[in-house]
Amino acid sequence: RFGNKIFIRGLIEITNRCRNNCYYCGIRKENRNIVRYELAQEEILSCCHEGYRLGFRTFVLQGGEAPAVKDEGMVETVAAIRQSFPDCAITLSLGEKSREAYERFFLAGANRYLLRHETCNEGHYHRLHPAEMSLSHRLRCLDWLKEIGYQVGTGIMVGSPYQTVDHLVEDILFIERFQPEMIGMGPFLPHHDTPFASFPPGDMELTLKLLSIFRLMHPAALIPATTALATLAPDGRERGILAGANVVMPNLSPSHQRAKYSLYDNKASAGAEAAEGLLKLEEQLKGIGYEVSRERGDYENGELTVDN
């Protein structure tokens, strides 16, 4: 469908502050052992300028879930990026928000939103998240995003604690019904400062099989080869691409902050995972017969469009 094109997205991890306490995540609210940070608007724009110079035409702003009082600042940041880079796509991955906040981000210039549901089985969801978090609200957020007009991404964590094959089948069927433009998935990786520290990581082969299933079921979807794959195995990203992924997201975040955005242990953020390593990434992809595309790669009307 895409020939040998792999789309690149510049990832900017804007904050590791989070109001949630998900049992699997290293930036959960109750983790007192990490230094919290939040990028100022000027720092985010600086990352975008560097990314644009390197050839990125999509920026992904990802961060822990912030309280509603921060929404106004995000609206201003999105508007500033849109004004400075009118030819670029802006993707947000900021968790669950009010419908009004999603609408304001969209009107300010955001095009895409990533919100992985992680699992659509109610019982399993409650084994991964504290009682105050709600699967039904998360799924409602996905519906809002679609109704507003975003290109929407959702997805799963493979091999999370207590996950069964039946849960994965439910996820496959949910994603088939929802028809997202983007499908994000990666293996569960434990973090030492979480309740799931002693659980084993998700299985690489199962992750790759699921990636291939999603590619066959959703031929036009944008599916990233995730950092988690590259963390699990040195050739994880290449194997993800060979299994059907068509997006990679090198890290544009300020290098001195990257280690603090520690969702799981030993997270890959250097070498080809970093934006500075774009040449290395291009070499690695060339080695398996693929090339980096600097096009935006928008998904419109059920088709992927690759011209700017």
What is the predicted role of each segment?
Residues 52, 176-308:
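Auxiliary Fe-S-binding modules of radical SAM enzymes
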Residues 98-107, 161-175, 230-243:
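Catalytic cores of alpha/beta
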Residues 69-94, 132-153, 178, 198-221, ...:
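Alpha-helix-loop-beta-strand connector modules within alpha/beta enzyme cores
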Residues 9-12, 32, 60-71, 123, ...:
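Glycine-rich, proline-tolerant flexible connector loops at the mouths of alpha/beta enzymes
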Residues 22, 61, 115, 145, ...:
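Conserved, mostly hydrophobic/aromatic
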Residues 1-21, 291, 295-308:
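Flexible, acidic/Gly-rich N-terminal and inter-domain linker regions that tether
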Residues 29-44, 51-72, 77-142, 151-158, ...:
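Core AdoMet radical
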Residues 7-43:
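Canonical Radical SAM [4Fe-4S] cluster-binding loop centered on the CxxxCxxC motif
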